[in-house]
Amino acid sequence: MFRAGFKRFWNHPAGPKTVHFWAPAMKWTLVLSGIGDYARSPEYLSIRQYAALCATGAIWTRWSLIVRPKNYFNATVNFFLAIVGAVQVSRILVYQRQQKRITAQSEQRTELARSLAA
């Protein structure tokens, strides 16, 4: 029984003898790297990089479910890549919005101090 299941997996059109298996397997490193970047400050993250990862993850997730044979392994890794990218983009945007608010408040305080000094 185990042997038959392994043989079916080994000879599958998206099995380990094909790029359809190894490309998604290697793509998990991008997902893990993105998860590792959760510990980094959004100040040091690239919005373009994570927007690209989010977009490609979403596009290739859909593609993996349309082609024959359906590649659920590829769809899964790309789905998680899109999620990681979206979370990082949202972190970056929140950080940028906070920085603008802090800058605006600082400018208001400076103007207030100048007007009081005059």
Curated annotation (Swiss-Prot):
One family name in Pfam for this protein: MPC
Keywords annotated in UniProt: Membrane, Mitochondrion, Mitochondrion inner membrane, Transmembrane, Transmembrane helix, Transport
GO terms for MF: pyruvate transmembrane transporter activity
Membrane topology: Multi-pass membrane protein
Segments traversing the membrane: 19-35, 50-66, 72-94
GO biological process, alphabetically ordered: mitochondrial pyruvate transmembrane transport
Entry annotated with the keyword Transmembrane helix: yes
Cellular compartments per GO CC: cytoplasm; mitochondrial inner membrane
Compartments in which it is found: Mitochondrion inner membrane
Chief location category: mitochondrion
Domain of life: Eukaryota
InterPro entries per the UniProt record, alphabetical: MPC
Family per similarity comment: Belongs to the mitochondrial pyruvate carrier (MPC) (TC 2.A.105) family.
Purpose of the protein: Mediates the uptake of pyruvate into mitochondria.
Subunit-structure text: The functional 150 kDa pyruvate import complex is a heteromer of mpc1 and mpc2.
Protein name as catalogued: Probable mitochondrial pyruvate carrier 2
Source organism: Schizosaccharomyces pombe (strain 972 / ATCC 24843) (Fission yeast)
Lineage: Eukaryota, Fungi, Dikarya, Ascomycota, Taphrinomycotina
